[in-house]
Amino acid sequence: MKVTLIAILTCAAVLVLHTTAAEELEAESQPMEVGMPDTELAAVDEERLFECSVSCEIEKEGNKDCKKKKCKGGWKCKFNMCVKV
């Protein structure tokens, strides 16, 4: 029983180390070039990348209240910016 448990734990540890090493090699094989846009930032929809502060950015027009900018549709407010969840 103890030998089986030790064998399973050893295999799990080897698998974790192998996966970590494979991820590091993959990251090293794809170096970022200077001026190359970050893939996460390039994928962000420009219309969604706006400040989501508590105060209104749009001034009141007549009797209408201004609308607060909110993040929606799988986006959340983090550090006053809308980011994909």
Swiss-Prot record:
UniProt signal peptide: 1-22
UniProt key word Disulfide bond: yes
Propeptide: 23-48
Disulfide bonds: C52-C66, C56-C77, C71-C82
Annotated tissue distribution: Expressed by the venom gland.
Cell compartment(s), UniProt: Secreted
One Pfam family per UniProt: Toxin_20
MF (Gene Ontology): toxin activity
Family indicated by similarity: Belongs to the neurotoxin 12 (Hwtx-2) family. 02 (Hwtx-2) subfamily.
Quaternary data: Monomer.
Protein name (Swiss-Prot/TrEMBL): U4-theraphotoxin-Hhn1a
Record organism: Cyriopagopus hainanus
